[in-house]
Amino acid sequence: LLAAALVMVSGSALAIDGQIDFYGRVAPGTCETHIVNKNGSSIIGDGEVRLQTAQIADITSAVQAQTPGAKAEDFAITADCQGAIKSLALTMSSPAYAANDGTLKNNTNVTVGGSAAATNVNIAVHDVTSGTPNLVKMNDASDAHILTLSGTSEGTYYFKASYVRADGSQDVTDGHVTTNALYTITYE
């Protein structure tokens, strides 16, 4: 009986299974966007902006409509459009992290590299395409940033992301700052 059981076990096949995650993007085919960081790295569609480390003493004020905050980091969004596109309108949103003042709240629910989240710190995004900084208000569909394309099918938005106090009357504590936003560009 033992010999029969060993024969049956040795004849059995072992199996392992797993999961493969696939990610992609389907665009309407009219405009392709790129996120360009300060190093000139360009990523189609999605991207990341890494701000320099700020000291607590650097983050002195709450958001201001026409003044970026501490350690402002440049980035751009380029749009390469086909056809007779005349203008672009950009809005930004963040279902999870938009603050009432139009900035992005820090994600305090994660630990990064063993570091807890900084408190009382938000990220402000200012559109500097025209030369004058203007706050991009998260989750405000009426705050469209218009870019007119002059005889070309390409356009570039220029931005600065910076640290600001979430509440000007509260102290900032150290830690990581992590957040995200979605951008939408409509065109005509």
Regions found by a protein language model. Give the residues of each.
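Residues within alpha-helical transmembrane segments of multi-pass membrane proteins, especially transporters
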Residues: 5-7
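Mature extracellular/passenger domains of Gram-negative fimbrial/pilin and adhesin proteins
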Residues: 14-188
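N-terminal signal peptide c-region/cleavage motif recognized by signal peptidases
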Residues: 10-12
